[in-house]
Amino acid sequence: MDAVDTTMEKLRAQCLSRGASGIQGVARFFRRLDQDGSRSLDVRELQRGLAELGLVLDTAEMEGVCRRWDRDGSGTLDLEEFLRALRPPMSQAREAVVTAAFAKLDRSGDGVVTVDDLRGVYSGRTHPKVRSGEWTEEQVLRHFLDNFDSSEKDGQVTLAEFQDYYSGVSASMDTDEEFVAMMTSAWRL
């Protein structure tokens, strides 16, 4: 393990100390920082973002992380590659079941899950807020998607956003068998 790997472990531990959604929250935050939509951050943006989140890296660690994910020598790091590396690693069995659950939800096969995709696999009719008249079934479906969606809450969930969410859940479960059983039951796979 080199210095950057050690730094990523340190960052990952700091994220996971925030709970199962720690990685997801960091991913949302950094995607929001990417104001120009370039899917990259420079050292200053990364440092400011980490500081705002209360995640601490020294200058050498920050520079090492940026060098590792600066794919084109532009002085910026590839945001998605960085976030993928930040996620706690999942075994092949865990990755496969997360991908299978996403594929089940993505009924249109276009790589994103929308409210329309959910209608066939998730019913909000029995949700307490629908039964009380407080929400519509559409609102329940949107709220459900928002659990996985990025900070933009655009009503579309990508596989990366779905993985961000489940990487945090995965980190809290000791065995592949336990995680796979939970996913299989939750998504009726």
UniProtKB/Swiss-Prot annotation:
Record's signal peptide: none
SUPFAM superfamilies membership: EF-hand (SSF47473)
Residues annotated as binding Ca(2+) 1: 34, 36, 38, 40, 45
PTM sites of type Phosphoserine: 40
PROSITE patterns cross-referenced by the UniProt entry: EF_HAND_1, EF_HAND_2
Record keyword Phosphoprotein present: yes
GO CC list: cytoplasm
Keywords: Calcium, Cytoplasm, Metal-binding, Phosphoprotein, Repeat
Transmembrane segments: none
Domain EF-hand: 21-56, 57-92, 93-128, 136-172
Listed GO MF terms: calcium ion binding
Subcellular location: Cytoplasm
Pfam family, any one: EF-hand_7
Binding site for Ca(2+) 2: 70, 72, 74, 76, 81
Taxonomy, superkingdom: Eukaryota
Statement: the UniProt record of this protein carries the keyword Chaperone: no
Record's function text: Calcium-binding protein. May play a role in cellular signaling events (Potential).
Subunit note: Monomer. Does not form oligomers in the presence of calcium.
Name assigned to this protein: Calcyphosin
Lineage, uppermost ranks: Eukaryota, Metazoa, Chordata, Craniata, Vertebrata
Gene that encodes it: CAPS
